[in-house]
């Protein structure tokens, strides 16, 4: 008995150490519970099984310490009664033997087989395992006998997998493009993607070509639709007629010139239906570029009533800075002549442009005129010298008769 108790104590101590080691491992795995869910469940089930075995062993020890269970004695009559026959006695003895054998078998199975795990050992699978089903819960049942009614196969859409594209069991979602294709193309695509046992397998290049052609057709159709929608919204370009330009000039004159007026003010004064600020702005910019020349500035200032700018203080003549009091007067006279001519020709042209004519002062002459003047002076000098010579000769001839006459008078 002492040896049995020592063995039991040693086995209990080893089981307790093993249980402590398992709990330590479970604490280590609990840190990585999301990465190792199956390991955590296995260790937990093992710990629960060891605890149940230890509890069962402790209950058996307490029963063995108390002593053997009481045996219920069967009271068998020593003398058979007269009412029981020999066959009934044999059947009762056989039943008693069978019941005894059943009890012995149950006790042997109880000691040999481990106790069933408690209901706490059954853990619920985690949420992330429930969301993605990695196993099949129902085993496929093979029909023992063929069913008399044939099952109707559901229409399945053929799927063509591309081996070049990355990705395993999870394929990216793509919209179906079969609805946009005509009937002939859908049938051709279906026949190329469906793979039979005896037919050839379609290549990935064919499927890619089909998809590229479909995309090109879709893009062309979308571009045509956009062009058809954008064309009716285009506004025709504004054509500035002479009457419209005349109103534009009148508005500028009322507002004080092109550099003061704004497109909004011009449009309000013109009072033309359909005329926008952008159109007036573009026309005003063109008008400013057109009238940026020196003569045009003088004309616009005179038309708007603004005094003309003062005359320049120096004028370059032959690479020499000369103060031009006479040039300023000549330029002002020429400008007045041009303005008068512009007023006379206003009815003929809407916006005439005149270029100023440079005039030299009275005392200054160009180089060619200087040469001509010098030549004329030389010619005059030459003619003057010849006249003097002829005059001297005439004086000599006239003096000689006088001398002769005087000599004649003296001689007489």
Curated annotation (Swiss-Prot):
<dbReference type="InterPro" id="IPR009057">
    <property type="entry name" value="Homeodomain-like_sf"/>
</dbReference>
<keyword id="KW-0539">Nucleus</keyword>
<dbReference type="GO" id="GO:0045892">
    <property type="term" value="P:negative regulation of DNA-templated transcription"/>
</dbReference>
<keyword id="KW-0238">DNA-binding</keyword>
<feature type="region of interest" description="Disordered">
    <location>
        <begin position="358"/>
        <end position="412"/>
    </location>
</feature>
<protein>
    <recommendedName>
        <fullName>Transcription factor NIGT1</fullName>
    </recommendedName>
</protein>
<feature type="compositionally biased region" description="Low complexity">
    <location>
        <begin position="395"/>
        <end position="412"/>
    </location>
</feature>
<feature type="compositionally biased region" description="Basic and acidic residues">
    <location>
        <begin position="383"/>
        <end position="392"/>
    </location>
</feature>
<dbReference type="InterPro" id="IPR044787">
    <property type="entry name" value="HRS1-like"/>
</dbReference>
<comment type="function">
    <text>Transcriptional repressor that may play a role in response to nitrogen. May be involved in a time-dependent signaling for transcriptional regulation of nitrate-responsive genes. Binds specifically to the DNA sequence motif 5'-GAATC-3' or 5'-GAATATTC-3'. Represses the activity of its own promoter trough binding to these motifs.</text>
</comment>
<keyword id="KW-0805">Transcription regulation</keyword>
<dbReference type="Pfam" id="PF00249">
    <property type="entry name" value="Myb_DNA-binding"/>
</dbReference>
<keyword id="KW-0804">Transcription</keyword>
<dbReference type="InterPro" id="IPR017930">
    <property type="entry name" value="Myb_dom"/>
</dbReference>
<dbReference type="GO" id="GO:0043565">
    <property type="term" value="F:sequence-specific DNA binding"/>
</dbReference>
<feature type="domain" description="HTH myb-type">
    <location>
        <begin position="232"/>
        <end position="292"/>
    </location>
</feature>
<feature type="DNA-binding region" description="H-T-H motif">
    <location>
        <begin position="263"/>
        <end position="288"/>
    </location>
</feature>
<feature type="region of interest" description="Disordered">
    <location>
        <begin position="54"/>
        <end position="241"/>
    </location>
</feature>
<feature type="compositionally biased region" description="Basic and acidic residues">
    <location>
        <begin position="198"/>
        <end position="228"/>
    </location>
</feature>
<feature type="region of interest" description="Disordered">
    <location>
        <begin position="286"/>
        <end position="310"/>
    </location>
</feature>
<feature type="compositionally biased region" description="Low complexity">
    <location>
        <begin position="183"/>
        <end position="193"/>
    </location>
</feature>
<dbReference type="GO" id="GO:0005634">
    <property type="term" value="C:nucleus"/>
</dbReference>
<feature type="compositionally biased region" description="Basic and acidic residues">
    <location>
        <begin position="90"/>
        <end position="112"/>
    </location>
</feature>
<dbReference type="InterPro" id="IPR006447">
    <property type="entry name" value="Myb_dom_plants"/>
</dbReference>
<dbReference type="GO" id="GO:0003700">
    <property type="term" value="F:DNA-binding transcription factor activity"/>
</dbReference>
<dbReference type="InterPro" id="IPR001005">
    <property type="entry name" value="SANT/Myb"/>
</dbReference>
């Amino acid at each position: 008995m002492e040896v049995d108790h020592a063995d039991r104590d040693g086995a209990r101590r080893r089981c307790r150490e093993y249980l402590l080691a398992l709990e330590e491992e479970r604490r280590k795995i609990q840190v990585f519970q999301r990465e190792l869910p199956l390991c955590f469940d296995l260790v937990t089930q093992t710990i629960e099984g060891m605890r149940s075995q230890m509890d069962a062993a402790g209950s058996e020890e307490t029963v063995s310490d108390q002593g053997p269970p009481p045996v219920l004695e069967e009271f068998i009559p020593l003398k058979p009664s007269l009412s029981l026959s020999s066959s009934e006695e044999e059947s009762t003895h056989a039943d008693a033997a069978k019941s005894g054998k059943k009890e012995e078998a149950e006790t042997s199975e109880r000691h040999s087989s481990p106790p069933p795990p408690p209901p706490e050992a059954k853990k619920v699978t985690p949420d992330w395992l429930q969301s993605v089903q990695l196993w099949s819960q129902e085993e496929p049942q093979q029909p023992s006998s063929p069913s008399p009614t044939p099952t109707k196969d559901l229409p399945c859409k053929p799927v063509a997998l591309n081996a070049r594209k990355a990705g395993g069991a999870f394929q990216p979602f793509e919209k179906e493009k079969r609805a946009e294709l005509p009937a002939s193309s859908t049938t051709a695509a279906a026949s190329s993607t469906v793979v039979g046992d005896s037919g050839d397998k379609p290549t990935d290049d064919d499927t890619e070509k089909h998809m590229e052609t479909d995309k090109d057709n879709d893009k062309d159709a979308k571009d045509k639709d956009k062009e058809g929608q954008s064309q009716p919204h285009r506004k025709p370009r504004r054509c500035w007629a002479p009457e419209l330009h005349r109103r534009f000039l009148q508005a500028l004159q009322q507002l004080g010139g092109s550099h003061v007026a704004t497109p909004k003010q011009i449009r309000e004064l013109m009072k033309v239906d359909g005329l926008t600020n952008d159109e007036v702005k573009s026309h005003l910019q063109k008008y400013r570029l057109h009238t940026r020349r020196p003569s045009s500035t003088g004309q616009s200032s005179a038309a708007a009533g603004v005094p003309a700018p003062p005359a320049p203080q120096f004028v370059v003549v032959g690479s020499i800075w000369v103060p031009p009091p006479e040039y300023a007067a000549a330029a002002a006279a020429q400008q007045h002549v041009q303005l008068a001519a512009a007023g006379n020709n206003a009815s003929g042209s809407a916006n005439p442009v005149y270029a100023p004519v440079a005039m030299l002062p009275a005392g200054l002459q160009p180089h060619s005129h200087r040469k001509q003047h010098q030549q004329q002076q030389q010619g005059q000098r030459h003619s003057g010298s010849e006249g003097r010579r002829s005059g001297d000769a005439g004086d000599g001839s006239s003096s000689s008769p006088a001398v002769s006459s005087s000599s004649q008078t003296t001689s007489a």
